[in-house]
Design a protein with these regions (language model features):
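Proline-aspartate-enriched helix->loop->beta-strand connector
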Residues: 1, 15, 118-135
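Alpha-helical scaffolding within the catalytic cores
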Residues: 3-4, 60, 114-121, 146-153
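Short beta-strand and adjacent tight-turn residues that come in two discontinuous sequence segments
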Residues: 19-20, 105, 132
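Active-site/pore-lining binding-face segments in mid-to-C-terminal subdomains
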Residues: 129-192
Length: 235
């Protein structure tokens, strides 16, 4: 489908269109491919190596998590938090990689995903943690709903104050768009769910990532602002 869409676009605009596999575990290959294509092998190789090392490190550490200790997570999407995606979806790759248990027992939808669920279903799943997705133009919507609406207060995650907003600077760290920001998102979420196993200095990791990928030096204040609703200030 993606190839046919690319061909249609190419036919319409009359210039070459390239389709890239955006799977999280293949981000290193994406950078290597792009480096070859545009003649920036050295720079692409640096970014590819970072992606590969980061993913491999998380995968290996996640093997240490006992099944009974795995954290149950609900991914709250859409404008009200009543849309989500199940395990194995392209939209939940970060959660799957770090060893979280996706509580959403729903059919997998293609494309944009976003299966509609009811609050009653979420109450029956009763997750340990809720991750809220930030929609453009609705920056505080889902997080505010989940943390202030009395209907959500019955959930274990709400009672334990374990509702978090996924960072979204400059792109989402978890999903939509499936960018390289998911690489720092993996380290953030791994630390958040399993601090005894993943001992990343997330403040230092963030600064390193932004400098490497965006040529931007984050200040301590910017780091704290990004993490304000995403698990608190870094250690």
């Amino acid at each position: 489908k993606s190839i046919s869409q690319a061909e249609n676009i190419q036919n319409q605009i009359g210039i070459p269109v390239v389709v890239i596999n955006g799977e999280l575990t293949k981000m290193d290959q994406v950078y290597e491919f792009l480096g070859d294509m545009i003649g920036e092998k050295a720079r692409a190789g640096e970014l590819a190596a970072y992606c590969r090392q980061s993913v491999n490190d998380v995968v290996e550490k996640a093997k240490q998590i006992p099944q009974e200790k795995r954290v149950r997570v609900y991914y709250a999407e859409g404008s009200t938090g009543l849309e989500t995606d199940p395990k194995g979806s392209q939209h939940t790759q970060v959660l799957d990689l770090v060893g979280g248990v996706n509580v959403a027992d729903v059919p997998m939808k293609g494309g944009m995903g976003l299966t509609t669920v009811s609050l009653e279903q979420i109450l029956s799943w009763d997750p340990d943690v809720i991750l809220t997705w930030t929609m453009a133009g609705n920056e505080e919507g889902v997080y505010k709903i989940v943390t202030t609406d009395p209907k959500w207060a019955k959930l274990k995650a709400s009672k334990d104050s374990r509702v978090y907003e996924i960072p979204n600077n400059p792109f989402n760290w978890f999903d939509r768009p499936p960018s390289s920001n998911r690489i720092i998102g993996v380290k953030w979420l791994a630390n958040l769910l399993y601090p005894d196993i993943f001992k990343y200095d997330i403040k230092a990791e963030m600064k390193d990532f932004y400098a490497k990928f965006y040529h931007y030096n984050l200040t301590d204040q910017e780091v704290e602002a990004i993490l304000e609703r995403a698990g608190g200030k870094p250690n």
